[in-house]
Amino acid sequence: MNVVQGNIESKNAKVAIVVSRFNSFVVDSLLDGAVDTLKRFGQVADENITVVKVPGAVELPLAARRVAASGKFDGIIALGAVIRGGTPHFDFVAGECNKGLAQVALEFDIPVSFGVLTTDTIEQAIERSGTKAGNKGGEAALGLLEMVNVLQALEEQL
């Protein structure tokens, strides 16, 4: 049996992190977690990490698409925080963001790690950005590192 799986270390990986500025009090912690994970666990060098800041979660897919189209990166991490309010706006923003990022991954054959929090409350967002529920930015970075390696292994085997 042949099993293809990735590891986490990706010293030569070039990673773009596309970050929403909206809800920056949460998203800044997600970015810190992602960068820390890329450096400490992936051994990714500073010069191989590019951060792209956009206004909000709706803009993440377009920026990710432009990054992917450049062909200069091995993977993309999308970070943001969409917090439910009193209107259906949350559902549209969260859904379109998720759909758009998945489309980028499939269209450009590049891993796009979804680190966009979709929570009911501000407290839940804070918990997931580095307090008692961990840091989802760091988790998104781990997933990306593994997928970069999985795709490289598949390329070598197929």
Swiss-Prot record:
Bilayer-spanning residue ranges: none
E.C. designation(s): 2.5.1.78
SUPFAM superfamilies xrefs: Lumazine synthase
Residues annotated to bind 5-amino-6-(D-ribitylamino)uracil: 22, 57-59, 81-83, 114
GO CC, one annotated term: riboflavin synthase complex
Residues at the catalytic site: 89
CDD domains: Lumazine_synthase-I
Residues that hold (2S)-2-hydroxy-3-oxobutyl phosphate according to the record: 86-87, 128
Record flagged with keyword Transferase: yes
Domain of life: Bacteria
Gene Ontology molecular function terms on file: 6,7-dimethyl-8-ribityllumazine synthase activity
Pfam families from the UniProt entry: DMRL_synthase (PF00885)
Biological processes annotated in GO: riboflavin biosynthetic process
Pathway named in the protein's UniProt entry: Cofactor biosynthesis; riboflavin biosynthesis; riboflavin from 2-hydroxy-3-oxobutyl phosphate and 5-amino-6-(D-ribitylamino)uracil: step 1/2
Summary of the function given for this chain in its UniProt record: Catalyzes the formation of 6,7-dimethyl-8-ribityllumazine by condensation of 5-amino-6-(D-ribitylamino)uracil with 3,4-dihydroxy-2-butanone 4-phosphate. This is the penultimate step in the biosynthesis of riboflavin.
HAMAP family: Lumazine_synth (MF_00178)
Oligomer and partners: Forms an icosahedral capsid composed of 60 subunits, arranged as a dodecamer of pentamers.
PANTHER family listed in its UniProt record: 6,7-DIMETHYL-8-RIBITYLLUMAZINE SYNTHASE, 6,7-DIMETHYL-8-RIBITYLLUMAZINE SYNTHASE DMRL SYNTHASE LUMAZINE SYNTHASE
Designated name of the protein: 6,7-dimethyl-8-ribityllumazine synthase
